[in-house]
Regions:
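Conserved pre-ATP/AMP-binding loop-to-beta segment of ANL
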Residues: 23-25, 156-158, 162-187
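Short beta-strand elements of ligand-binding domains
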Residues: 68, 91-92, 133-142
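Conserved AMP-binding/adenylate-forming
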Residues: 36-38, 51-95
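Helix N-cap/beta->alpha junction signal
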Residues: 68-70, 115-116, 140, 183
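AMP-dependent adenylate-forming
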Residues: 12-39, 144-146
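Adenylate-forming
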Residues: 13-17, 27, 43, 47, ...
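Conserved ATP-dependent adenylate/AMP-binding module captured primarily in the ANL superfamily
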Residues: 95-126
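Flexible, non-catalytic linker and terminal segments flanking ANL/adenylate-forming cores
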Residues: 1-11, 30
């Protein structure tokens, strides 16, 4: 395979996905408590679905903060951000609330994607103070008792798995990738 012909990681992923058996496993949890797997086709569709939501809420070049441990949803989110024209700002899960506040103040993300309630608790005080954050997407369902999280605007929060249940139109499945080799990429 000649990598010179690919302008971006997302373009390379779509090329590889088209060559694979749609039912072959591409991503899998390494957590022994979760045996969830994702085929190449599911992964591709999930990237389109998350990208659709991101595109509706960002302009090209906007930052999207990604706070998660290594898991399949991280990969899907990173490629969805790239497909949307956003820039992934990855963050360690070991940061403190002050670290996250500094990072959010510095990069001013339009979207924050966060893995679980524990991480969301560290971020939420800052999220509630910042008007530039349009959406927060969570991999794990937000705790039913919102008082623990002090969520001011419930419409700002989206559930990753709920987004994945949505259908896509054919136009949403177009791999319209306007990325160049010089475009920013999180690797």
């Amino acid at each position: 395979m000649n990598l010179e012909k690919f302008n971006s990681l997302i373009e390379l992923f779509f090329y590889q996905a088209e060559k694979q058996d749609s039912k072959s496993i591409f991503l899998q949890w390494l957590n022994p408590n979760n045996n969830k797997t994702f085929t190449w086709e599911e992964t591709k569709l999930n990237i389109f679905k998350i990208s659709k939501i991101i595109k509706e809420n960002i302009k090209e070049g906007d930052r999207c903060l990604l706070v998660s441990e290594n898991r399949p949803e991280w990969f899907v989110s990173d490629l969805a951000i790239m497909l949307s024209g956003g820039i992934t700002v990855p963050a360690y899960t070991t940061y403190t609330e002050d670290d996250y506040k500094y990072l959010i103040d510095d990069c001013e993300p339009t979207i924050i994607i966060v893995s679980n309630n524990e991480m969301l608790k560290k971020l939420n005080a800052t999220i509630n103070q910042k008007n530039f954050i349009k959406k927060v997407i969570t991999f794990d369902e937000i705790e039913k008792s919102h008082h623990n999280l002090n969520i001011n605007n419930k419409d700002k929060y989206l559930d990753f798995n709920f987004i994945l249940k949505n259908d896509l139109s054919e136009k949403d499945k177009i791999q319209n990738v306007n990325l160049k080799r010089s475009s920013a990429a999180c690797i």
